[in-house]
Amino acid sequence: MAKGKENRIIITIECTEAKKEGKPVSRYSTTKNKKNTTERLLLKKYNPNLQRHTVHKEIK
């Protein structure tokens, strides 16, 4: 049996700037190690609706 696979979980990140502007949000799914990164993840990703890179925040 594989050891240590239970620490990495799949999360969804959502654009924060599109919500403020009233435009459709973009969502990405990625993985994170919950042992090393306990706080919410913030990444800069491309939002095709706004046609620019924006801050994406982890959602539950």
From Swiss-Prot:
Organism: Chlorobium limicola (strain DSM 245 / NBRC 103803 / 6330)
InterPro entries: Ribosomal_bL33 (IPR001705), Ribosomal_bL33_sf (IPR038584), Ribosomal_zn-bd (IPR011332)
Keywords from the UniProt entry: Ribonucleoprotein, Ribosomal protein
HAMAP family assigned: Ribosomal_bL33 (MF_00294)
Disulfide bonds: none
Protein name: Large ribosomal subunit protein bL33
Molecular function GO labels: structural constituent of ribosome
Keyword Ribonucleoprotein: yes
Single GO cellular component term: cytoplasm
Keyword Ribonucleoprotein: yes
Any one GO biological process: translation
Entry's family note: Belongs to the bacterial ribosomal protein bL33 family.
